[in-house]
């Protein structure tokens, strides 16, 4: 699942050079994202299908993202950002600074994971396609980023 989380983070960091330029900060953020706790709250099994409710506890990346977004808007409106500002660099510096500064795991979200038994009798999950689970593991950042993109239209 480490590769999956790196892929999720990479989708947030779309510039190929960012991971290289901010290698230390990028690595720190990946490790922070992987540092989540979980607790199985409930499970319901019905033959070859099951639903497991899991509470994820992690860092509040969503709030850090929202604060970063608000700061970018404020700086743009105040004239701090000019045509000479490298916006990507400005945003990535702020993103890594805000997210890597998080110290407490105070974000909690309970999600449902769908499971099915395969022909070998092993359980498989929907974790690869479960956007609620990804959002929980990313501390609500997907929810808040979609709210920001909707509200800025």
Model regions and ranges:
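Core segments of small alpha/beta cavity-forming domains
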Residues: 1-39, 63
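Intrinsically disordered, low-complexity acidic Ser/Thr-rich regulatory segments
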Residues: 23-30, 88-104
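Proteostasis/folding factors centered on peptidyl-prolyl cis-trans isomerases
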Residues: 39-44, 51
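Residue-level signal for tight coil/turn positions that link beta-strands
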Residues: 45-49, 119-120
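Hydrophobic membrane-targeting and insertion signals
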Residues: 47-49, 145, 151-153
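A short hydrophobic beta-strand element
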Residues: 48-58
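Short, cysteine-centered beta-strand-loop-beta hairpins and adjacent loop/turn segments enriched
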Residues: 57-72, 103
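Short beta-strand edge/turn micro-motifs at domain boundaries
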Residues: 75-87, 101-149
């Amino acid at each position: 699942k480490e590769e999956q989380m790196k892929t999720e983070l990479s989708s947030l960091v779309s510039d190929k050079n960012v991971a290289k330029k901010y290698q230390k900060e990028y690595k720190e953020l990946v490790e922070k994202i992987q540092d989540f706790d979980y607790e199985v709250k409930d499970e319901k099994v019905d033959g070859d299908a099951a639903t497991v409710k899991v509470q994820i506890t992690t860092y509040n990346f969503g709030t850090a993202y929202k604060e970063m977004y608000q700061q970018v808007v404020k700086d743009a409106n105040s004239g701090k950002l000019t045509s000479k500002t490298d916006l990507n660099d400005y945003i990535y510096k702020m993103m890594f600074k805000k997210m890597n500064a998080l110290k407490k795991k105070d974000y909690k979200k309970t999600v449902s994971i769908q499971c099915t038994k395969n022909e070998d009798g092993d359980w498989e999950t929907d974790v690869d396609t479960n956007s609620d689970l990804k959002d929980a593991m990313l501390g609500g950042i997907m929810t808040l980023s979609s709210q920001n993109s909707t509200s800025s239209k």
